[in-house]
């Protein structure tokens, strides 16, 4: 026995017995006259490995489309009659919606309260509040940028309005 054979026997066990078993199985099929077609087919049917297709796991793509649809911005038109409706306007601002507030139907005291409340909400949200007309305000959250000025279109009497 050579060194290589000793190492194989140590790790794999004695392989001489396995070789003899394989030859014995082959001898039973051949029987000295050649195997019949049926014996040949039976032998190779049993020994053919079954092939199973391995499904590749579904890989999720890291590709993101360039032109994604952005969420639509909304502008809410509000015409409150009492100060109690101010909380609803504040909720719209918190949800990053611009709000136009028409206070023509409110009393002067309640419209002052509304302006004070909305000024606080807009300040807390880092937004902007702008007078559009005599009794109308535009309140926008920080995700909306205002450009331009309306005061140039108003007369001096409208700018110095003492209604509030």
Curated annotation (Swiss-Prot):
GO terms for cellular component: cytoplasm. It holds the Pfam family SepF. Gene3D superfamilies: SepF-like protein. InterPro entries: Cell_div_SepF, Cell_div_SepF/SepF-rel, SepF-like_sf. Residues 29-57 are annotated as: Disordered. Its main location: cytoplasm. GO terms for biological process: division septum assembly; FtsZ-dependent cytokinesis. It is found in: Cytoplasm. Keywords: Cell cycle, Cell division, Cytoplasm, Septation. Belongs to the SepF family. Homodimer. Interacts with FtsZ. Cell division protein that is part of the divisome complex and is recruited early to the Z-ring. Probably stimulates Z-ring formation, perhaps through the cross-linking of FtsZ protofilaments. Its function overlaps with FtsA. This is Cell division protein SepF. The gene is sepF.
């Amino acid at each position: 026995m050579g060194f290589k054979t000793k190492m194989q026997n140590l790790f794999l066990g004695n392989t001489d017995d396995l070789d003899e078993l394989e030859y014995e199985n082959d001898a039973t099929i051949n029987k000295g006259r050649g195997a019949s077609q049926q014996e040949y087919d039976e032998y190779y049917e049993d020994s053919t490995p079954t092939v199973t297709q391995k499904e590749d796991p579904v890989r999720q793509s890291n590709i993101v489309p360039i032109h994604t649809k952005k969420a639509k911005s909304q502008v809410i038109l509000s015409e409150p009659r009492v100060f109690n409706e101010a909380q609803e306007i504040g909720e719209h601002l918190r949800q990053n919606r611009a709000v136009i507030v028409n206070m023509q139907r409110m009393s002067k005291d309640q419209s002052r309260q509304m302006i004070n409340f909305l000024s606080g909400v807009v300040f807390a949200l880092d937004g902007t509040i702008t007078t559009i007309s005599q009794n109308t305000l535009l309140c926008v959250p920080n995700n909306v940028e205002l450009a331009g000025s309306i005061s140039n279109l108003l007369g001096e009497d409208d700018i110095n309005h003492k209604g509030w």
